[in-house]
Amino acid sequence: MAALGHLAGEAAAVPGLGTPCASRRHRLSGPVSSAGNPSTVCLCPGQPTCSNADSRAHPLGDEGGTASKKQNKKKKTRNRASVANGGEKASEKLAPEEVPLSAEAQTQQLAQELAWCVEQLELGLKRQKPNPKQKEQAIGAIRTLRSKRTPLPRKRQLMHSLFGDYRAQMEAEWREALRALRAAAYSAQVQPVDGATRKKSQRVCRPRPIWRAKATLDLPDEEFKFNFF
């Protein structure tokens, strides 16, 4: 009896054909456990070995590459914009400021403005026909502008009240005069004549025959008379 019990225990220990349920359970345990456990191993294309949970976290290879390219493009555009802004700021810093005029230049400019205003008033008196009141006002303004006792703010106020923006008017008049001078200088230049024009206006000078010259010289000195008979 002891020997039969020992043989039965060895048969139960070794798996054989008589235990199909155990082998099926052993085979099905792998897929069931992998489906139930989210941390089972899978292979993602283009990526190292990872779990299913990690595969949800990172995108696929192509999507990740496009996202990284977009980020790089955004960074490049930002860098270019910052460089451009920096260049504009540097150019603004390097731009020279307007140099104020010296005392001598200011005095000369004021003299030119006063002379222009006085000239305009005198031309208005000559060309126009002002009434006595306007004539008196113009003469008084000329005296005020030419007076050395009148303060400078008073002169500028008077010029502004009479002519408005007199500096802009002076600039426009100066440009017009410069344009007229350029036109006169251009018209005064000797321009070459075309060959066709020279051929049309060309004159042929030929010497006179000798016999005609002698005939005019050998005329007698007799008085000319009409011979009707």
UniProtKB/Swiss-Prot annotation:
Q: Which residues carry this modification: Phosphoserine?
A: 82
TM ranges = none
Disulfide bond annotation, renumbered to this chain = none
Record region (Disordered): 55-101
The Omega-N-methylarginine modification is found at: 27
Mention any Pfam family matching this sequence. Answer: DUF4615
Keyword field? Acetylation, Methylation, Phosphoprotein
InterPro entries xrefs: DUF4615
Stretches with biased composition (Basic residues):
70-79
On whether Cytoplasm is a keyword of this UniProt record, the answer is no
The molecule here is called UPF0488 protein C8orf33 homolog
Q: List the source organism.
A: Pongo abelii
Q: What is the lineage of its organism?
A: Eukaryota, Metazoa, Chordata, Craniata, Vertebrata
